[in-house]
């Protein structure tokens, strides 16, 4: 990034980053599932999310200090050096955790796409994430264009989100683990819908922060629950494939939801962005409720 001087070079870098960045979450989530018993996985994924968001809170602060005292180039070189160091530590100290594949397991003939239950969960989760993505991608633009709240102020929303996750993710997940996973997925999606649906009625920055806090509660409920459920659902030797498909939900949502919302902004009205986001998350919530009722009926 220190050598990127044009839009074209940045596009190439972003494309490479888009391919490489999911590898950590896929491998990390699969490794957690290999190491942790089923009944403790939700808490383990909560701790993993806490660590990631701790980096989200502290990284920009450290990076901003380096930029202020030195330069952008120094900040990028420092980040690259730390990542190389971490890659080396992971290579030398982390051991393979994937269970050995039994000889009679028809690995080559198995396909993630044939697991209809899993694909159904992915579909409903995609609807939920499509609403979530709006808050992180479109909110700064919405605030600047309609309320003259600049990016250096709106970035506080994301710091609040990360800080709440650091402080409350583990305790929230322990509470949510007492209930049906499908029920908690539905609750998380409904909280998304509530937060997004409130935004057209807000006019002051303090209330936008409150909306982000509400959204974060939904995020803390649904994300570890889905990840834990999928890790339990996946066969041992196909865990990384299932986690890869789960990670793809975010890529699909990031590629589609801002595009649809942008068209709504241009053709209808800016406030209808959030109506769309709320409705799409309600579709996800309805799907999870149907799964919960179906499982409840069987039990």
Language-model regions: role of each:
Residues 8-13, 121, 206-211:
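Short hydrophobic/alpha-helical segments at membrane-entry points of transmembrane helices
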Residues 95-123:
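Juxtamembrane intracellular "pre-TM" segments in multi-pass secondary transporters
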Residues 1-5, 191-203:
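C-terminal ends and interior cores of transmembrane alpha-helices
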Residues 82-99, 287-292:
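C-terminal membrane-cytosol helix-exit motif in multi-pass small-molecule transporters
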Residues 15-52:
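Cytoplasmic helix-loop-helix junction between adjacent transmembrane helices
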Residues 168-180, 265:
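Helix-to-loop junctions at the C-terminal end of transmembrane segments
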Residues 137-153:
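Short amphipathic helix-loop junctions that connect adjacent transmembrane helices
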Residues 240-266:
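A late C-terminal transmembrane helix in Major Facilitator Superfamily
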């Amino acid at each position: 990034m220190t050598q990127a001087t044009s839009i074209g070079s940045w596009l190439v870098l972003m494309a490479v980053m888009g391919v490489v960045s999911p590898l950590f979450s896929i491998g990390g989530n699969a490794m957690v599932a290999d190491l942790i018993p089923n009944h403790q996985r939700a808490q383990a994924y909560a701790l993993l999310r806490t660590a990631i968001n701790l980096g989200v809170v502290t990284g920009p602060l450290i990076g901003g200090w380096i930029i202020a005292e030195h330069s952008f180039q120094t900040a990028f070189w420092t980040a690259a050096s730390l990542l190389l160091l971490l890659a080396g530590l992971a290579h030398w100290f982390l051991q393979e955790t994937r269970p050995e594949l039994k000889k009679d397991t028809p690995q080559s003939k198995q396909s993630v796409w044939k697991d209809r239950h899993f694909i159904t969960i992915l579909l409903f989760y995609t609807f939920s994430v499509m609403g979530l993505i709006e808050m992180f991608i479109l909110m700064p633009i919405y605030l600047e264009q309609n309320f003259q709240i600049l990016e250096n102020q709106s970035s506080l929303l994301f710091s609040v989100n990360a800080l709440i996750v650091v402080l409350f993710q583990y305790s929230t997940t322990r509470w949510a683990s007492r209930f049906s996973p499908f029920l908690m997925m539905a609750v998380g999606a409904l909280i998304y819908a509530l937060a997004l649906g409130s935004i057209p009625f807000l006019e002051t920055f303090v209330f936008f922060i409150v909306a982000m806090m509400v959204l974060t509660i939904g995020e803390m409920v649904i994300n570890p629950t889905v990840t834990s459920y999928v890790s339990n659902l996946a066969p041992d030797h196909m865990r990384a494939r299932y986690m890869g498909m789960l990670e793809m939900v975010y890529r699909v949502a990031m590629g589609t939801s801002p595009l649809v919302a942008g068209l709504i902004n241009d053709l209808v009205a800016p406030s209808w962005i959030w109506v769309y986001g709320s409705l799409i998350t309600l579709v996800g919530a309805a799907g999870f409720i149907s799964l919960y009722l179906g499982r409840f009926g069987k039990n």
